[in-house]
Design a protein with these regions (language model features):
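Conserved catalytic-core motifs of eukaryotic protein kinase domains, centered on the activation segment
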Residues: 41-42, 84-91, 127-131, 179-180
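Conserved Rossmann-fold NAD(P)-dependent oxidoreductase catalytic core, especially the SDR/UDP-sugar
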Residues: 102-144
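NAD(P)-dependent short-chain dehydrogenase/reductase
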Residues: 154-210, 215-226, 255-259
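C-terminal substrate-binding subdomain of Rossmann-fold SDR/epimerase-dehydratase oxidoreductases
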Residues: 198, 203-360
Length: 360
């Protein structure tokens, strides 16, 4: 089996590469990535690309068609990947997350790819009062990031897919340790605050709901999806990926971290205005379709892995929100240094100064 992983040098892609190699040891794995975060390694001995057969550098908006030749499955992770980045680069978010994703899906279908897996998001539900959101419930995307995800999902259903099966995994909020760690995720941020500062400050009143999924379980869901048959949910499926027990209020997350990191204080702004982004999610369809891929990593285990990982790194950066572990800060540094344009394309000068060279 030949698998193309777009965005393989990111937070999820680094874990997915390892997971795919473990599950399909004889497969041919090809990575495609712009390289924006290639240097953001958790440790110098953790280079996931060594598990690939080939690494290709490029812009997902200009992916070469021939790269899809002979590919059996595509795991499409490339994206401007959270709300702050979507707000800062709103137009680019639409271009990369939606326009390029839809174009890639059509290209994959035209080239005979059997399975196309799209990393979508539960953030499309936005503000959801009442019970947990099911796939059939209305979506209220409140951000450019969320709009790009639901826009892509809808467009996939209008494509000429031929024999290709499409799976849009509406992931819960990611958390957990990775070879390319991100600290701009709610649980990861809380653990970093506890380790470096001994205090977690919750800027909201702590009431908003968030579903969580460990990055290891995200990878396991993708492994299931790249082998999914159309009779298992339909030719073009959108499914919430997570577990019902993974729905938490933000204050519960902070309190869980404080229990595991001794001496951590939790400060909650109970006078803060309500956070519009609040939603509980129903994961019963995923449990039915993919019982072997139901998330296994508990909240406490995610916290422990993060705490152990950060401690092993000697992490003590109280100013980590300005570090490479915050993806928006990394992009902004590239732009200020003249390596990236405002529309997130490598500038010619970067080719000789920093930009990674293409590898065959």
């Amino acid at each position: 089996m030949r698998v193309l992983i777009t965005g393989n040098m990111g937070y999820v892609g680094s874990v997915l590469t390892r997971c795919l190699r473990a599950n399909f040891p004889a497969s041919e794995l090809i990575g495609f990535d712009a390289g924006f975060f290639g240097h953001c390694l958790t440790g110098p001995d953790l280079l996931p690309e060594t598990l690939l057969d080939r690494q290709v550098f490029g812009d997902i908006r200009d992916i070469p068609a021939e790269l899809l030749n002979g590919v059996d499955a595509v795991a499409h992770l490339s994206a401007v990947s959270n709300d702050p980045m979507g707000a800062r680069f709103e137009a680019v978010t639409g271009e990369v997350n939606q326009k390029a994703s839809v174009a890639l899906a059509q290209l994959a279908a035209d080239r005979g790819v059997k399975n196309f897996v799209f990393a979508s998001s539960c953030s499309i539900y936005g503000f959801a009062e009442g019970g947990p959101r099911k796939e059939s419930d209305p979506t209220i995307p409140l951000t450019a990031y969320a709009r790009s995800k639901i826009g892509s999902e809808k467009a996939f259903g209008e494509l000429e897919l031929d024999a290709m099966t499409v799976t849009s995994l509406r992931f819960a909020t990611a958390c957990g340790m990775s070879e390319r760690l991100r600290l701009d995720l709610v649980l990861n941020d809380f653990v970093a605050c506890a380790i470096a500062c001994g205090e977690i400050t919750v800027l909201s009143d702590g009431a908003p709901w968030r579903p969580l999924i460990d990055v290891e379980d995200m990878a396991r869901a993708i492994v299931w999806a790249i082998a999914r048959k159309p009779e298992e949910g339909g030719k073009c499926l959108a499914v919430n990926a997570g577990r019902d027990e993974g729905n938490y209020q933000v204050r519960e997350l902070a309190e869980a971290v404080a229990r595991q990191v001794p001496g951590t204080r939790v400060s909650i702004n109970r006078n803060a205005p309500p956070d519009k982004r609040s939603y509980k999610v129903d994961f019963s369809l995923f449990r039915k379709l993919a019982p072997a891929a139901v998330p296994q990593v508990s909240l406490d285990e995610s916290i422990k892995r993060l705490s152990d990982g950060l401690t092993a790194m000697g992490f003590a950066d109280r100013d980590f929100r300005n570090s490479p572990y915050m993806r928006l800060k990394t992009l902004e540094r590239h732009i200020v240094a003249g390596r990236l344009s405002a529309d997130l394309r490598w500038l010619p000068a970067a080719a000789t100064s920093w930009r990674p060279a293409a590898a065959a």
